[in-house]
Amino acid sequence: MPHLTPLHYGKFWKFLEYVGCRFERQRGSHLIYTRSDLARPIVFPAKKQLSRTVILSNLKTLNISKEKYLEIMQKIK
C-alpha cells in the first residue's frame, strides 16, 4: 500500500477541488478553502512541499480517511 508522502501544494489543491471544496481567499502565503458541510476552513501554505502533518490535519477536518485520500489521489493523477 502506498505511503502518505509530502506533496506539492498544487496537487493538494486539485484534491480539494475534487472533493467539493472551493477557494475562498488567501492570506499571505496561506490558501483557504471552504465547503458548506465543514465546521472550519481548510488552510494550507503555498509551499513547494506540504508536510504529512498538514495533509493529515486537513484530512481530519474533511473527515476523509488516509486510505480514501490515497485512492482519490490515484484517480486524479
Spans of features found by a protein language model:
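Basic nucleic-acid-binding interfaces
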Residues: 1-30, 34-77
